[in-house]
């Protein structure tokens, strides 16, 4: 392992994992480990499917960190937004056409740069169920707009769309529409599976891995000097791109198989990195 200069952590099921809840908060153990990491001059950052300010806004206002948000659709570095993907209205129209066949029940929505949600049909049963949030899931949006997505894109004054999400009632819907999108658009869009039942659609090849690479390039850090930790499907791209990858031990076996190391917590990952960094420095001094 190279000397690690930066660690990117997923949120749900990773940094925010306090058993048995995947999204509970930053444990005292993890918070103390982050401080140790930073004291050793290793940057701690976030790579998440959530918005860039979800962590500080929802859980801890002190944790304003470099963030690859929305699975790579938006990036914040040193407190500044440095990148956001941007769908033109005609591109949204084409996506709506793909999802118009009603082959599988779904909830299709788009996200604006202000983190407002725009549903394909805001009056649909799926949209109403999302608003009710019976499961108590910690949601991440500023407002749910009353306009339909088709109405929203007709107004040129509205901000362009950052990314699109689609959640299906059955897993078969994911495979069906992923195939449809790839055949229709010939890899024009990045389609990232975020769970067995959902996908996010983005432009410019955006994903967690490419977002991390953008930050690394700006900071002058090599990919071999970065570590990543996650637990779900939307971490596959960063596991593939970053050699020093860690997966949470509660993740499914097929997800764990994508990573190099398996750990129980972010704190365990950090301790491993600090130990390896210490060993690397001793080797450089020819003391090992």
Placement of each model-derived feature along the sequence:
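Hydrophobic packing residues within well-ordered alpha-helices of enzyme cores
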Residues: 55-58, 181, 255
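Conserved acidic, metal-coordinating active-site core of Asp-based
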Residues: 107, 112-229
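Active-site phosphate-binding/coordination module
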Residues: 28-132
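Short, structured coil segments at secondary-structure junctions
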Residues: 62-63, 71, 185-187, 241-242, ...
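Short, well-ordered alpha-helix to beta-strand connector turns
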Residues: 4, 41, 64, 161-162, ...
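A short, Lys/Arg-enriched amphipathic alpha-helix followed by its capping loop at the start of a domain
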Residues: 3-8, 29-42, 181-185
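Mg2+-dependent phosphoryl-transfer enzymes with acidic/Ser/Thr/Gly-rich catalytic loops
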Residues: 2-6, 15-17, 27, 199-288
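Hydrophobic beta-strand scaffold residues
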Residues: 44, 106-108, 191, 245, ...
